[in-house]
């Protein structure tokens, strides 16, 4: 009798995706982040569900309902901090996952890559709306500043902003709709992630060499299931270290002050994982220009396959491109640092230079480095 996992309509899908899936024999730990993102998403949905049971999306009670969760609900504090720090872990895994894709040329799987970019945008939108929900000072002013950016759109901008707000300022209507969207988006992300996986399994995984591995495949289970479990243990270890020892390390102290429309905080800044994009936004003196640069800083990922001028897929055997890649990483870290600093000298000029460098490396230096390497191969 054939095994049920190979015949049952539902089990067959699971089997082909996680058990009998042919995987390259040489994929490194950089390939762990996909499964870690899945774990993060499940964790966020579960903790979020339990938080939603006690949260009230109303301007008068939102802040106190979060306090109530932390003080009065059984293990509410751990659920709240797992959700808040889980978002940070989610973005760490996301950045690693995207970085891996850039380094090893995984963006040549066009459909998988483009859905990945959509997933990145959806996750960023979800995180932004979630940050508004506790209704602290940074929640309110973050929502005001970021939604206000849409007013830079010519002609329809102002109407669009007021439509999103549901009034003439960030208020009760805004909070209620953000809660509704924050609840539904993760399920859309889960659906998109399944499509992401579907397209990936059409081609099979890439590997560090970038060379087709059809001649050397191994079953996903037990080899990569055990490897993914190790990754998951480390992820949960780091998350719980954050939650139990320094739960507020990555948060903003201003968010422990209830939202007050009459009092602007001295430094309005988003969560750490948006600081690089925020720095790019602030580095352009023009409002519309800044908004475009902000969107393009992420959207540039879509054209990565067009910018691939190398004859090799991966950067494994391309030292000049490797150099460019790590300069880009350093540049992103610089932008992240600048995004958290006040708008004054010397931070303004550093931010502007880092922003120019960001686009210059991706659009010019990396493709040129690839062409140089192609020519070096002829020698």
From Swiss-Prot:
Its main location: mitochondrion. Heme b b566 binds at residues 97, 196. Its cofactor is heme b. One of its GO terms (molecular function) is ubiquinol-cytochrome-c reductase activity. It is a multi-pass membrane protein. Heme 1 (or BL or b562) is low-potential and absorbs at about 562 nm, and heme 2 (or BH or b566) is high-potential and absorbs at about 566 nm. This is Cytochrome b. It comes from Ovis dalli (Dall's sheep).
